[in-house]
Design a protein with these regions (language model features):
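Residues lining hydrophobic/aromatic ligand-binding pockets adjacent to catalytic sites
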Residues: 1-133
Length: 133
């Protein structure tokens, strides 16, 4: 299985879908905590589900099991938690909940998975951590 992280932010639809096509993804796994507001643009949950099916002919799943804890995300976004502490807390949480094993049970049959996160020019995303664990 190949894992890729991709940001839903600061990207055009063209660039987003070109990357998915280059990776030949068969699953787009959305692990964002909040993916329904207008700021998400073309990557809002319902829109992204449609576009992934119609453009990429892949499966789209929003799975909050792999989202960060709301308090940790808030602390990171408000700069009261460093990236290193946030990434470590997220990894500990995944391990404590057995989420890594769940990931492979749920998605182990896919050959190329794009994990949707929220990285920007100014911040990293928990999707980057999930790809590595």
């Amino acid at each position: 299985m190949k894992l890729h992280d991709i940001s839903a932010y600061q990207t055009s639809a063209e660039h987003f879908f070109e990357r998915l096509q280059a990776w030949d993804v068969d699953l787009v796994l959305d692990v964002r905590l909040h993916n329904t507001n207008q700021l998400a643009g073309f990557t809002k949950e319902r829109d992204l589900d449609y576009f992934v099916r119609e453009i990429e002919h892949a499966t789209y799943v929003h799975d909050p099991e792999f989202s960060p804890k709301p308090d940790d995300l808030s602390a990171y976004l408000h700069k009261t938690m460093s990236w290193e502490d946030y990434a470590a807390a997220y990894e500990r949480d995944l391990e404590a909940r057995g989420a890594v094993a769940d990931f492979f049970k749920k998605y182990g049959s896919y050959h190329s998975v794009a994990i949707v996160g929220t990285a920007t020019d100014k911040r990293k995303s928990h999707a980057e951590v999930l790809v590595k664990v």
